[in-house]
């Protein structure tokens, strides 16, 4: 069966839209009136109060919408609403770095229902966004190449539908943890995929299986660039889910949203932070997260690393292929940006057991102390590790070394030093520091360039 609506056309429940393994139920989307898609415009001129737009040239021209700016649509997901703070917070961060038409798309009329129905209603949302983009183009001469659609959860697939309906002419779609149930493993027609825009970038933060882990996000790659921060499954600062018994996804409602969805919501928090940290989310190409954490994927290759989030489109090789996978670590709360460094320490002095820590000092900032090695400290041995600093130090000027040995009282007061410390940044730039001194336990040793 099918339903047809003015402006938007017809919607069927034929395969692959329904009646396939991933979507066994034959369900049609609700009417546009019931889904009630709304376009809430924020601009640099009205940062705190939106102007509600409709896809009508006179309404658009009488608003603060400007033809000489990019337009970024932000589409929320299941249970959510367009007036939720996170959408306008992304707009507010954007206003700090650019002039932009920032349109928060509200479809709470269609998102606050059972999940299976909501996953059909996004077809209407995608069609409404596509129609809006078509009106901009046909009535106002505004090119889809100035349009970027950002979608979270089900909103990612609504963005994909908008892109499919505009024949891939939209400049960019960003998927923030695209929803897994009813979408993972389905044909491209139904879900977000790289053909939906000229460039599609995706952040996966909740990619554990829905059963039994309740991971809402897809593990499947669906973009040109797919980022898996912290491995993509368990985000630092999110509690492990104790709802590991199987929950009927159609029975999840608002009270459990933050609790169930901490990992799932991290994706838009990372995006918001990335706007203000243009180099704080470098993603490293790597075979797996385990290989990445084993320090085998550093530094960035010669073409550089893409930045997860807002500046992913600056990566020269962004559309050289689909399903290009990248890994990185983030912080655990509010300031999520991190800068990865590799540090190698060549020891001198006595042979003892202990820990060695190093801190970095640069023209843009200083890092805290990071442990590089613990175990037997043997002169002339070199130990290396990588760490993710919450400070970008810039050009390195000096490093400081310290060691301690776990409260084992050693009456000989041994002295240990670092004859050489090498620091490598993610762009491959290497800095060497040397010292001929040794120090007692818990005494800082400063090494200068050599």
Swiss-Prot record:
Highest taxon, organism lineage: Eukaryota
Annotated positions binding Ca(2+): 188, 191, 193, 196
UniProt keyword annotation of DNA repair present: no
Cystine residue pairs: 4-10, 91-102, 91-104, 238-262, 286-297, 300-305, 434-450
Keyword entries, A-Z: Calcium, Disulfide bond, Glycoprotein, Hydrolase, Lipid degradation, Lipid metabolism, Metal-binding, Secreted
Transmembrane annotation, as ranges: none
Active site, UniProt feature: 153 (nucleophile), 177 (charge relay system), 264 (charge relay system)
Activity regulation comment: Inhibited by bile salts, is reactivated by (pro)colipase/CLPS.
Positions bearing carbohydrate: 167
Boundaries of every PLAT domain copy: 339-450
Pfam family, one: Lipase
EC category name: hydrolase
Principal location class: secreted
Functional description taken from the UniProt entry: Plays an important role in fat metabolism. It preferentially splits the esters of long-chain fatty acids at positions 1 and 3, producing mainly 2-monoacylglycerol and free fatty acids, and shows considerably higher activity against insoluble emulsified substrates than against soluble ones.
Family: Belongs to the AB hydrolase superfamily. Lipase family.
Name of the molecule in the record: Pancreatic triacylglycerol lipase
Taxonomy of the source species: Eukaryota, Metazoa, Chordata, Craniata, Vertebrata
């Amino acid at each position: 069966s099918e339903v047809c609506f003015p402006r938007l056309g017809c919607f069927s429940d034929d395969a692959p839209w329904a009646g396939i393994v991933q979507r066994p139920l034959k369900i049609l989307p609700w009417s546009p009136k019931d889904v009630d898609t709304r376009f809430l415009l924020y601009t640099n001129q009205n940062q705190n109060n939106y102007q509600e737009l409709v896809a009508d040239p006179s309404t658009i021209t009488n608003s603060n919408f400007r033809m000489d700016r990019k337009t970024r649509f932000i589409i929320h997901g299941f249970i959510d609403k367009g007036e939720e703070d996170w959408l306008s917070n992304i707009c507010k961060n954007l206003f700090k770095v650019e002039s932009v038409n920032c349109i928060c798309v509200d479809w709470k009329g269609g998102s606050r229902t059972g999940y299976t129905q909501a996953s059909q209603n996004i077809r209407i949302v995608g069609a409404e966004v596509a129609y809006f983009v078509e009106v901009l183009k046909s009535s106002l001469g505004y090119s889809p190449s100035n349009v970027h659609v950002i979608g979270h959860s089900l909103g990612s697939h609504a963005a994909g539908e908008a892109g499919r309906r505009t024949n891939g002419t939209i400049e960019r779609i960003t998927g923030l943890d695209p929803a897994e149930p009813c979408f993972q493993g389905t044909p491209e027609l139904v879900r977000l995929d790289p053909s939906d825009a000229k460039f599609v970038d995706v952040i996966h933060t909740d990619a554990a299986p829905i059963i039994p882990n309740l991971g809402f996000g897809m593990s499947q790659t669906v973009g040109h660039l797919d980022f898996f921060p912290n491995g993509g499954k368990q985000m630092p600062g999110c509690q492990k889910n104790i709802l590991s018994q199987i929950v009927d996804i159609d029975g999840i409602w608002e009270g459990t949203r933050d609790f169930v969805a901490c990992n799932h919501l991290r994706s838009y928090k990372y995006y918001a932070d990335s706007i203000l940290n243009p180099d704080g989310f470098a993603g490293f190409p790597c075979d797996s997260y385990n290989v990445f954490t084993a320090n085998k994927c550093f530094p960035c290759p010669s073409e550089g690393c893409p930045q997860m989030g807002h500046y992913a489109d600056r990566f020269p090789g962004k559309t050289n292929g689909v399903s290009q996978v990248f890994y990185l670590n983030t912080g655990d709360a509010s300031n999520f940006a991190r800068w990865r460094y590799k540090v190698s320490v060549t020891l001198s002095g006595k042979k003892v057991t202990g820990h060695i820590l190093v801190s970095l000092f640069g023209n843009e900032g200083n890092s805290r102390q990071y442990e590089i090695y613990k175990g037997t400290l043997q002169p002339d041995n070199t130990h290396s590790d990588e760490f993710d600093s919450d400070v970008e130090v810039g050009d390195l000027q000096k490093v400081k070394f310290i060691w301690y040995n776990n409260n084992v009282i050693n009456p000989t007061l041994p002295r240990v030093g670092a004859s050489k410390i090498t620091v490598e940044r993610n762009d491959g730039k290497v800095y060497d520091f040397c010292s001929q001194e040794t120090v007692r336990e818990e005494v800082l040793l400063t090494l200068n360039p050599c």
